[in-house]
């Protein structure tokens, strides 16, 4: 009988803390600026620090950014790789989704934000909604969940391109090396 009386309060406390944690995640939207689109493998600011703050989680050695505008929406710019103590970027967009309907590219509005444990993009057009949530599943695996809502058939195209330029400071190249 004592076990039941102890277990019930513990169970209630856990349930309350889990629901409070879920509600609190939205209170921390964009606490850290995770936006950016690197154009160089080593992209530094005026003080030789990284210009961008990629999202890393679970001890991962790779990270991602949120899009900084229409040219990068539909993807998570980066991928940022930790190489010893430095960050090197692999692509401005490694894999970006473009949606076509009736032979025309869908013109989306973008809402992108970070919350603890995830990067989120919501792309909205008249007849099409796309919600993309990127999370880390393990230290070596980031997963992208994509939900697409439309009443008409769509063509989905994934594209990307690796970076070729080596190094810049404040967006200005430090050398012509590739």
Describe each model-derived feature in a short phrase.
Residues 3, 19-22:
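Extended, charged low-complexity regulatory segments
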Residues 1-10:
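Bacterial N-terminal signal peptides that target proteins for export
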Residues 21-178:
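Terminal accessory carbohydrate-recognition/targeting modules of carbohydrate-active enzymes
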Residues 9-17:
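Bacterial N-terminal signal peptides
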